[in-house]
Structure formats: structure tokens, C-alpha cells
Amino acid sequence: MKEIYHDIFIGNEQDYYAIQQESNWAVLHCCKHPFHCQFVGYRGTLPSTHPNYALKRIQNEMALNLVDMDRFSENYLDFNRDMFDTAFSFLDEYRLQGYKILIHCNQGESRAPTIGLLYIARLGTFEYADFDTSVQKLKEVYPVYMPKRNIFLTVKSLWRDFVLNPVEEVNT
């Protein structure tokens, strides 16, 4: 587990189990198995029409239906934008109450650090730098970062939706 911003940590499944019983943590589970499946109560696949298809919150924990794959598709950008927006509102709620935040996935190498990167960049951690610069800065503090293609390109595609960059001109 590594602190990447004041009281915001990224890590793996074992890091979650280490803090699970502590009351001053809010947790974002960035993995379908086992957390989203357990929170919603299913095995295998869930119909996309299910009300908790994208995510489910139980008190100070939220589980995302997020799988790590190499295949990227722009077809899921709107789905992911909405999911990340809801997840970041959840994290903001607890961060502003003084909770420590753990953003984790199974191995702590791909999904959690990438979503953690987007979240802390949105807070201004890297002075609203562009995506590639922010990735390099994250790698300096979290060298085990090895994103898979899908989550990497998804967050890169959504970067401007979440990270304001007052230095960069936006041509519309």
C-alpha cells in the first residue's frame, strides 16, 4: 500500500484485508472479482440492465464492476465516465470527512493506480498536468504501476473530463 496524496492510498487486495476492520477508512474496490460480485450477490456475469451493474456502495465501501483487460473499446467510455464520476463523489464525501482512502484492485498494478491517478490529478496533485506527464510522476512514487491497455486508454480518453488544465488551451 502506498500513499499517493494526503490520506489517499493505492494498493492490492491484501492491503484491503489489512485495514478492513478499521473504522477510519473508505474503500474503493476497483475489481469485479471478488468484491463487486460479493456486494451485488452474483457469480459469472450480471445483466447490464441490473441496477447495480456498474457499482454498488455499502456504507464506506464501493465496489466497481471493473475488469482488467488488454482490449480497449471506446464503446464503454460513457459507462466508465459515469462510473468514475459516481466513485469520485463517493471518495470526495469520505475524504472531506477526514477518512483515509484506499483505492485497490486485485494486484495493485493496473486498475487501482490508474483510477487513483485520475482521482488525485483531478484534485490538482500534479498541477493539472497532461496525462502522460502525470503518469510519469505517478511512476516515480509508485514504480510497480503496470497498467493494462484498456484502463490506461480509458483514463487517457477521459482525462479532460476530470482534470482541468488552466494552462492548456482547448480547441473546440
For the regions a language model picked out, list residue spans one by one.
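A phosphate-binding catalytic loop at a beta-strand-loop-alpha-helix junction
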Residues: 99-117
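Charged phosphate-binding loop/patch that engages nucleotide di/tri-phosphates or the phosphate backbone
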Residues: 144-172
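Alpha-helix boundary/capping detector
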Residues: 113, 117-120, 160-165
